[in-house]
Amino acid sequence: MSDQSARARARLMREALVEAKVGLAQSREARDATSAQLERERTELATVRRRGQLATAINDAETVRLAAEFDRKHSERIAVLERKLAALAQEVALVERETAEMSAQLKRLAGGGDPAAPPPADPDPLPD
């Protein structure tokens, strides 16, 4: 590979790495926002259940009915948010691995190595 094409390839890899890091930051923000939203929904569900119990204790049928309706809605939202949070956590882990791989490839390229080559094996810490 010529020196000029190596520089061009390194530049393209750096640009791709920057885009990946921006995407990683956005994924982390989405994960954190979803986590916060999930906690709010759980708090709301606890409040609704407490109100339903209080309404049951005083025989307020309308409030009991409304509490049951809101319990169902919050429970459904919680289930969706839990799945969403799990998917976002997997996405963040995936993008973190990909970003680390891209960084390693870029370092190998900058060091004059083949970016497609596997990273060098760690030396065996145990002597023979």
How would you describe each model-predicted region?
Residues 116-128:
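Extended cytosolic assembly modules
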Residues 1-119:
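Extended, charge-rich alpha-helical scaffolding segments
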